[in-house]
Swiss-Prot record:
Interacts with UvrB in an incision complex. GO terms for biological process: nucleotide-excision repair; SOS response. It comes from the Bacteria. Keywords: Cytoplasm, DNA damage, DNA excision, DNA repair, Excision nuclease, SOS response. Belongs to the UvrC family. Residues 19-97 form the GIY-YIG domain. It comes from Aromatoleum aromaticum (strain DSM 19018 / LMG 30748 / EbN1) (Azoarcus sp. (strain EbN1)). It is found in: Cytoplasm. Gene3D superfamilies: 5' to 3' exonuclease, C-terminal subdomain, GIY-YIG endonuclease, UVR domain, UvrC, RNAse H endonuclease domain. This is UvrABC system protein C. The gene is uvrC. The UvrABC repair system catalyzes the recognition and processing of DNA lesions. UvrC both incises the 5' and 3' sides of the lesion. The N-terminal half is responsible for the 3' incision and the C-terminal half is responsible for the 5' incision.
Amino acid sequence: MTAPDAPFDARAFLRTVPEEPGVYRMIGADERVLYVGKAKNLKRRVSSYFQRTQPSPRIAMMVAQILRVDITPTRSEAEALLLENNLIKSLAPRYNILFRDDKTYPYIELSGDEFPRLAYHRGAFTKGARYFGPFPNVWAVRESIHLLQKTFRLRTCENPVFQNRSRPCLLHQIKRCTAPCVGLIDKEAYAADVRLAARFLEGRASEVIDDLTARMHAAAERLAFEEAAACRDQVRVLQAVLARQFVDSRKDEDVDIIAAVEEGSVTCVNIAMVRGGRHLGDRPQFPSATAGIGMLDAALAFIEQHYREHELPAKLLVDVPLAPVRVLMDEICDKPCTLLVPRLQAEKVWMGMAENNARLAIIARARDTGRAEMRLEALRETLDLAEAPRRIECFDISHTMGEATVASCVVSVDGAMKNSEYRRYNITGITPGDDFAAMRQVLERRYGKVAAGEGVCPDLILIDGGKGQVSSARSVLADVGLESIAMVGVAKGEERKPGLETLVFPDGRMQNLAIDHPALHLIQEIRDEAHRFAITGHRARRAKARIGSRLEDIPGIGPMRRRNLLASFGGLDGVRAATVEDLCRVGGVSRKTAEAIYNALH
């Protein structure tokens, strides 16, 4: 190992580095970790830092401080990625640039069901389903789903609704669904529509239009004029959309445009996505720390993080020097990609749009930051705090007559909601409907861990409730030794009207703020988010608890019998109201099965 005060001998060190996946750590003076990185080939990746020329002054400055490089070979790239993430979180290296984005990129899902469902999707992929994306934003997904519904009329309903319908829904009436739920289209015809939709999502729009045009002519020759007209309408819809969204009509291209823009001390990297020639929109992102970060460093960090998790398109257009990007892409990507700077007119238009949107994002960020600071300062003055509360945690309780009680904790940092730190708690072991006991339990679970050294201590706690809830919360904080944390309750106003809330302090004081007070607006925003997060969790828990009352979970009831039952009685409520004798009259339902149905629904 090299002595701390000796110059680092990179050449000698590199001879010892294996060509294996792993994690490397650049160590500087006082054993301070300068940088943590992951590589699929440690030797090649670490060697790239010690070339004669560096990609940027920031990297050159880091390399000049290196006294040692520690490496940890791993069994796979996936293991290296996990280790790298853990080390970055625990060591907080100075030269790591992180793009923190609480929301994952959205996808379009085609489920693996007999009649596949078209759906918006975030999160982990389900086995058997097909996914198309990523899309830069929710709007792009929603618009694409709307287009696919209008053109190919695929179902979007969830399986419980699909399996229990006895008549077509409104979407069928407005020609947005072919109603496979009630057998108005057979499996083969529906599968053909699914194939066309999949090809369109894969960027093969021209093939889809050619296919539909051929179908139209074939139908016309058979004198099937209604079918021909339907194909004609599909072609017109697709052509109209493509005419509006194509930014280069010469070919169906898959391109990512990455623009790095610096305004003052703020750097923004914007990624715009073109799939099959359609411009899907863009997504500006900001590094977690911007001091001293140039456009090249920000772009390289974004490219490395983004394409570790997302598929590389056929073409990547950047506005920074190609050489360092090419070295990075060779390291992190297995498939070839054409790397370009804008030269053609269409490419310059794409990049200009991306750069302009990055500048607009910087302006919006500055405006939002100023607004958040103003609201936090108003809250500090209102609550008479020494400093503006950077981290605020808010709690709410949700249940239905004591059933399936769920507590929520949402987090706001510097005036912005931190979705990745939200938590839900299933409340058990209390008297149903006892909100005070529920609040006590969630706070004990949350702040018992904080008192033990796990988690982060907030600057302010908001409690959705009045004096009783605040009293319970105050007691818990005293029990765990955290009574010094500022806390306030938010009691609902008359008829729960916004703007009439009352602030309830632990000492019993109560205060009302003006309806236009910026501190009240911040409190309302955080409180409403806690309520939303609690009630969605409660509904999911309640639905799960009641799932046994649905027909599909009754032994002996398959899809055909379920459909016959719903058709005979007009829906689940009608089945529930039927007697055993009524149920026996349905074809295929024996008395034993009828009794099982009756017992399950009562």
